[in-house]
Amino acid sequence: MKVNPKNSPKDNLKDSPKVSARGKKVNKAWLHDHINDPYVKLAQKEGYRARAAYKLKEIDETLGLIKPGDCVVDLGSTPGAWSQYVRRKLSPTGAAAGELNGRIIGLDMLPMEPIEGVAFIQGDFREPEVLQKLEQALATDKGQVKVDLVISDMAPNLSGIESADAARIVHLVELAVEFAQNRMKPDGTLVVKLFHGSGYDELVKLFRATFKVVKPMKPKASRSNSSETFLVGKGLKKRAETVPELA
């Protein structure tokens, strides 16, 4: 999810009427790397909408996050690669088309093409009325369903001003943590995307204060030249508890 949609380097090259020579080189290099990226090719082969699916796949396979019957909330779900991966994990082997052993709810400001079995809410996660829609989606005849797993690929539109960008990133992660505290099962898990830099240590401290186990991860599908990383928090805890790291 992009809180304010931001252009990719490809979009910038296409939409900008004037591109500097240096900018053209950067965009050409990005396009070359993207086209030849093994995860891009694998995503196309396996039917995923984005290479990001393999980031979640590695995290899941390393930590065993997704289990049959789980209720999963995907924050920043567009274009849908993470929801696709969860959808496949929750489909029983040999199941008929459309059969799903669990629940998946995606949320994003941007529209998302439908995925069978995935409920989607379009809206800004920061807005109370959008959170209310998410609450309603979790409601059943027996009351509110507690969530097993919250996955967040939310990211703000970066301005290039480090202090402002850091504050936006911190705010989104704080909202994801607050949602997990309010709607997740005590033994549930939260996975968030964030970036090394200003505000990173603050978010690690927040996770340590909130979860029994905290694990920073940089999946192989995250580009090596990117500051992107992920934090995994397992098991909600009381503030007084200490937090070990996963080995």
UniProtKB/Swiss-Prot annotation:
Annotated Pfam families: FtsJ
Compartments, as annotated in UniProt: Cytoplasm
Keyword terms: Cytoplasm, Methyltransferase, rRNA processing, S-adenosyl-L-methionine, Transferase
Gene Ontology CC: cytoplasm
Binding site residues for S-adenosyl-L-methionine: 80, 82, 108, 124, 153
Residues annotated as the enzyme's active site: 193 (proton acceptor)
Residues spanning the signal sequence: none
Gene3D superfamilies, per database record: Vaccinia Virus protein VP39
SUPFAM superfamilies found in the cross-reference section: S-adenosyl-L-methionine-dependent methyltransferases
Region (Disordered): 1-21
E.C. number(s) listed in UniProt: 2.1.1.166
A molecular-function term among this protein's GO annotations: rRNA (uridine-2'-O-)-methyltransferase activity
Catalytic reactions on record: uridine(2552) in 23S rRNA + S-adenosyl-L-methionine = 2'-O-methyluridine(2552) in 23S rRNA + S-adenosyl-L-homocysteine + H(+)
Predominant subcellular localization, coarse grouping: cytoplasm
Stored InterPro entries: RNA_methyltr_RlmE (IPR050082), RNA_MeTrfase_FtsJ_dom (IPR002877), rRNA-MeTfrase_E (IPR015507), SAM-dependent_MTases_sf (IPR029063)
Residue ranges with Basic and acidic residues bias: 8-17
Similarity field: Belongs to the class I-like SAM-binding methyltransferase superfamily. RNA methyltransferase RlmE family.
PANTHER family linked to this entry: RIBOSOMAL RNA METHYLTRANSFERASE (PTHR10920), RRNA METHYLTRANSFERASE 2, MITOCHONDRIAL (PTHR10920:SF18)
Function: Specifically methylates the uridine in position 2552 of 23S rRNA at the 2'-O position of the ribose in the fully assembled 50S ribosomal subunit.
Protein name (Swiss-Prot/TrEMBL): Ribosomal RNA large subunit methyltransferase E
Species, as recorded: Polaromonas sp. (strain JS666 / ATCC BAA-500)
Gene that encodes the chain: rlmE
